[in-house]
Amino acid sequence: MKVVLYMAMTVNGYIAKENGDTPWSDAVWNGYYNFVKKRGNIILGKRTYELMKDANEFEKLNFPTTVVVSNSPDKQGGDKTIFVPSPKEAVRVVKEKGFSEAIVGGGSKLNAGFLKEGLLDEIYLDIDPLLFGKGIKLFDETDTEAKLELLAANNLSKNTLRLHYKVLK
């Protein structure tokens, strides 16, 4: 099972504004929708899940199998939404559902949890030409470090770049 973190971010490393707003370009949104639709699953933190649910994002993703890592995992989500207490449990559920890749879609705390537990195999970053003065970082405060190997760098559009890294273990 390959675990892949997929995030959009600004040039200065933010994945959202402080209020959770994500004003990404069409190139980033289209890249994100296609990436998740092709794989059929996504693992989210509770806040990111709520923001996406409120914005009707799951319809645009063809209602993928969604695993939400939450401190209250007993919450019911629906046919394709499963709540779990930890990143390791999220990966187990995705694998049990028959997927070969688990897609981690944020937020910052969840990303840090996957990094800290050594679960990430690859990272895709779509870099939009934006700067946020303040915001939510790619990884919440963590003392965990990782070395990466660049596998590919491609343009999604004239101004937007996709970086693909392997996490070295």
Which role does the model predict for each range below?
Residues 1-169:
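Enzymes that bind and transform nitrogen-containing heteroaromatic metabolites
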